[in-house]
Amino acid sequence: MKILIFIIASFMLIGVECKEGYPMGSDGCKISCVVNNEYCKGQCSYISTQEDKKWKGSDGYCYFWGLACYCTGLPENAKVWDSKTNKCGG
């Protein structure tokens, strides 16, 4: 029983440490793609979190329905697109 609780707690900690989302370009829009996963992996491995610092995401892929790159394994302070604060095109 203790092992089961430990495993569940471990999964919860892993989920807390990793952020996911759509990376933003300099214009505040999602980075678009069609079916190019390699392009998105490159974009996701070099996400800006501050003006002068870059952080690496663990992986990325082209989300077909959204026609945009989607990144996984990002640090918590990485800037990602959010529909609530969308300033794309404005």
Swiss-Prot record:
One biological process term in Gene Ontology: defense response
Annotated organism of origin: Rhopalurus junceus (Caribbean blue scorpion)
InterPro entries found in the cross-reference section: LCN-type_CS_alpha_beta_dom, Scorpion_toxin-like, Scorpion_toxin-like_sf, Scorpion_toxinL/defensin
One Gene Ontology cellular component: extracellular region
Tissue specificity remark: Expressed by the venom gland.
Segment forming the signal sequence: 1-18
Disulfide-bonded cysteines: C29-C88, C33-C62, C40-C69, C44-C71
Residue ranges annotated for the LCN-type CS-alpha/beta domain, each copy included: 19-89
Domain notes: Has the structural arrangement of an alpha-helix connected to antiparallel beta-sheets by disulfide bonds (CS-alpha/beta).
Protein name per its UniProtKB record: Putative beta-neurotoxin RjAa2f
Locations listed in the record: Secreted
Function: Beta toxins bind voltage-independently at site-4 of sodium channels (Nav) and shift the voltage of activation toward more negative potentials thereby affecting sodium channel activation and promoting spontaneous and repetitive firing.
SMART domains: Knot1
Keywords, in A-Z order: Disulfide bond, Ion channel impairing toxin, Neurotoxin, Secreted, Signal, Toxin, Voltage-gated sodium channel impairing toxin
Superkingdom, taxonomy of origin: Eukaryota
Family membership noted in the UniProt record: Belongs to the long (4 C-C) scorpion toxin superfamily. Sodium channel inhibitor family. Beta subfamily.
Pfam family, any one: Toxin_3
